[in-house]
Swiss-Prot record:
Catalytic activity, EC: 4.3.3.6, 3.5.1.2
Protein name stated in the entry: Pyridoxal 5'-phosphate synthase subunit PdxT
Alphabetical list of NCBIfam families matching this protein: PLP_synth_Pdx2
Cellular component GO terms, alphabetical: cytosol; glutaminase complex
Keyword Lyase appears in the UniProt entry: yes
Function according to Swiss-Prot or TrEMBL: Catalyzes the hydrolysis of glutamine to glutamate and ammonia as part of the biosynthesis of pyridoxal 5'-phosphate. The resulting ammonia molecule is channeled to the active site of PdxS.
Active site (catalytic residues): C78 (nucleophile), H170 (charge relay system), E172 (charge relay system)
Keywords carried by this UniProt record: Glutamine amidotransferase, Hydrolase, Lyase, Pyridoxal phosphate
Record-level GO BP terms: glutamine catabolic process; pyridoxal phosphate biosynthetic process; pyridoxine metabolic process
UniProt: L-glutamine binding residues: G46, E47, S48, R105, I134, R135
PROSITE patterns xrefs: PDXT_SNO_1, PDXT_SNO_2
Annotated Pfam families: SNO
Quaternary assembly: In the presence of PdxS, forms a dodecamer of heterodimers. Only shows activity in the heterodimer.
């Protein structure tokens, strides 16, 4: 199995390191033709407007959207969650827009408002998951086809819809491998 990581801006190296710890081969994605070489893809955290612009500039936006709609497993963290959302509150920024969610950007506040919290995520295990939130979004609305996996103060911070998994937090910034393992075992192999 080979997982692509969008490698234009943001925390792509940290995702690669986490996947390597799980024994998963990775490929840095920067060109549309690379999409045929992977079994799943991660869209990392970073700055969603910048990543969206770069996806357009590198002619990756449409091919990536088509591959995801055709069933390519995708995991979007923070900015990646924003880019996968069909709707972004008060924004018309470029996005992939494949997941039936509405998100609010920087919803937990600015950089100084970043925080960590232990999350209950039964889908990934009984023990709480340490979640790192940095200028994080959250999900305002989901369609019935979207499974809510985790909340913080009644705000949705992790969800899944078929081949699409999103989190408002950064699992790649902790030593806990369970979220990435869930993506590989349940989303990629579970389809």
């Amino acid at each position: 199995m080979k997982i692509g990581v969008i490698a234009m801006q943001g925390a792509f190296r940290e995702h690669e390191q986490t996947l390597a710890r799980l024994g998963v081969e990775t490929l840095r994605i920067r060109r549309p033709e690379q999409l045929s070489q992977i079994d799943g893809i991660i869209i990392p955290g970073g700055e969603s407007t910048t990543i969206g612009k770069l996806l357009g500039d590198f002619n990756l936006m449409e091919p990536l959207r088509e591959r995801i709609l055709s069933g390519l497993p995708v995991f979007g963290t923070c900015a990646g969650m924003i880019l996968l959302a069909k709707e972004i509150e008060n924004s018309n920024q470029p996005r992939i827009g494949t997941m039936d969610i509405k998100v609010a950007r920087n919803a937990f506040g600015r950089q100084v408002d970043s925080f960590e919290v232990d999350l209950e995520i039964p889908e990934v295990g009984q023990e709480p998951v340490r979640a790192v939130f940095i200028r994080a979004p959250y999900i305002l609305e989901v369609k019935p086809s979207v499974q809510v996996l985790a909340k913080v103060d009644d705000k949705i911070v992790m969800a899944r819809q078929d081949n699409m998994l999103v989190s408002a937090f950064h699992p790649e910034l902790t030593d806990d491998l369970r979220i990435h393992r869930y993506f590989i075992e349940k989303v990629c192999k579970g389809l």
